[in-house]
Regions:
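Helix-to-catalytic-loop junction in kinase catalytic cores
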Residues: 1
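Helix-rich C-lobe and terminal helical cap/extension of kinase-like folds
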Residues: 18-168
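Conserved catalytic-loop position in the HRD/HxD motif
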Residues: 4, 9-11
Length: 168
């Protein structure tokens, strides 16, 4: 969060851990810089109150280019429902001080949602890709990290340190 840069290909072959437990990136080919105009609204969505405030939520989704000015109210409501559901799952690790990534039910929620969305005809009918170009890297990163943490059966991971509410 301090650098506003991240590694968009998190898998074990791209990192080492030294004797002092420092994480060392080996593959720099997928380092991405996050511009403030994406960073700020993206991480505002981690905050549950912002997702539950319909006006604020719509405003943030518009900033992130998920909702377009020409969208119908029906399209907007569909996208808001979809992103609310997605974010309610993907931000779970940041809603508590510690998170148990070994919890199979959390990972199963992600898998089930992915399967359901891949078959959703209304989603397929949406015009083109939605959202800022930075979404693909952020979502790939979080999915990769969650998958890695699940595979490692990581428990009691301090996630509050990385919540936007603690970042100045």
């Amino acid at each position: 969060h301090e650098l506003k840069e991240f590694h968009a290909d998190p898998h074990p072959g791209n990192f080492l851990v030294d004797d002092d437990l420092n994480l060392i990136a080996l593959d720099f080919g997928c380092l991405k810089k996050i511009p403030n105009e994406f960073y700020t609204p993206y991480f505002e969505l981690v905050i549950e109150e912002n997702r539950n405030d319909k006006t604020k939520f719509r405003e943030i989704l518009t900033k992130l280019e998920v909702i377009y000015p020409e969208d119908s109210e029906k399209e907007i409501e569909f996208l808001e429902g979809l992103f609310h559901e997605l974010l309610s799952i993907f931000t779970k690790p940041f809603q508590t001080d510690n998170f148990d990534f070994s919890d199979e039910s959390f990972f199963q929620e992600i898998v089930d949602l992915g399967k359901r969305l891949s078959k959703d005809k209304e989603l397929r009918s949406q015009n083109g890709g939605r959202g800022s170009k930075h979404f693909i890297y952020m979502n790939r990163t979080f999915f990769g990290l969650y998958n890695l943490m699940f595979d490692l059966k990581s428990k009691d991971i301090l996630t509050s340190k990385f919540s936007p509410s603690t970042i100045s």
